[in-house]
Amino acid sequence: MYPAHLLVLLAVCVSLLGASAIPPLPLNLVQFTYLIQCANKGSRPSYHYADYGCYCGAGGSGTPVDELDRCCKVHDDCYGEAEKMGCYPKLTMYNYYCGTEGPYCNTKTDCQRYVCACDLQAAKCFARSPYNNKNYNIDTSKRCK
């Protein structure tokens, strides 16, 4: 084997080892975004829910600041239950439809059904809960104890 080929092979192996340490992106986040948009037709963009209160977005702690934030806590808890069932809610892809009455799930496996139900429940909760701009991008270290 030529030294240049060996170097290329070594570089590929090292890069693959490094890539294995990178956590996968949550694949169903796009689906959840579409469910939110379907349930909240003509409402605010779904990214407004990504950094709201103590529970909307990554992580969560303390007492939810309002009804909308409680929706996110319930969603987090629902994902926790899915994990206890052996599901991977952030990676589970499912089938859903956006009908005239709003979104609904149409999936085959137990994990798909459960995760879709979690997302659907949250999207509908977002639709009926008031959005308070004061709770967007809050200082969670002070308000989420």
Swiss-Prot record:
E.C. number: 3.1.1.4
Gene3D superfamilies: Phospholipase A2 domain
GO cellular component, one term: extracellular region
A Gene Ontology biological process term: lipid catabolic process
Pfam hit, one: Phospholip_A2_1
Signal peptide positions (record): 1-21
Protein name in UniProt: Basic phospholipase A2 cPm08
Subcellular location: Secreted
Family: Belongs to the phospholipase A2 family. Group I subfamily. D49 sub-subfamily.
